[in-house]
Amino acid sequence: MQLMNNLKDNGFLILVHLSNIELYYSSEENISDEIILLAGDEFKHAVKVMRSKIGDTIYVTNGTGLIIKTEILTIKKDKLSAKIIETIKTENKFENIFFCIPKLKNPERFKFAIEKCVELGVTNFIIFESKRTIAKGTNIKRWEKIALAAMKQSLRAFLPKIKLLRNLSEISESNGEKIIFEQNVKRKFQFEFKMDKSYYFIFGPEGGFTEDELKFFDADSIYSLSDHRLRSETAIVKAVSLI
């Protein structure tokens, strides 16, 4: 894309100065070499809530690492067009890290876990059901909306990917290092990150893992996060903070 010609690689330094901006999301099909379109909820927020008008500067991410500075050209009934002025490239340091999270009984605690992970940089989620999962039903669209909102709020530019798996055996077969958190082990969590490896961090549901589920994984892959019992969402946020 021609917009890459104006790319700024020092994304972190620029983002420090953009800490007060409002960030919008537009998918790749709405982005050309020179123009970005905003439609749907993003358009409504920009025009109805933020009162943006023709000539104003707005910032848009494409969800694949770019933050794009634009100037609004036209505003119509259900969409706006904006001219691309400059692009900022950001780095996905968690590209090879997968957070495997059980469905939690309390929707607000589940929402909290997703939000905080995204704010701290996680971009890959696997939501799974275990034998002791209490929560019923699946709402991937809601989870994706939560992740999208957290991405924009924290000025991140990688749209999180969320995948649903029915059991732990599917995760155990994934290609990468598995790290399982279980309260009843003595081995304390230690982590050395290698950029060329994939890591799967696996968290238990409210009732913990069963013995049969833990047999899917090597004993050396099981760690404790704390001397005290943590709620599932607390363990999730603590782990990503440590990483």
Question: What positions do the PLM features span?
Answer:
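A C-terminal functional module that forms or caps the active site or interfaces directly
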Residues: Y199-E211
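Thr-Gly-centered strand-to-loop micro-motif
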Residues: S26, I202-P205, S224-S226
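N-terminal positively charged helical leader segments and presequences
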Residues: M4-K89, K141
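Strongly charged, low-complexity linkers/loops
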Residues: E182-D196
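RNA substrate-binding interface of SAM-dependent RNA methyltransferases
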Residues: E91-E177
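Conserved beta-strand scaffold positions in the cores of enzyme catalytic domains, especially
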Residues: I162, K178-I180, A219-S224
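Structured adenosyl-cofactor binding patch, chiefly the S-adenosyl-L-methionine
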Residues: E211-I243
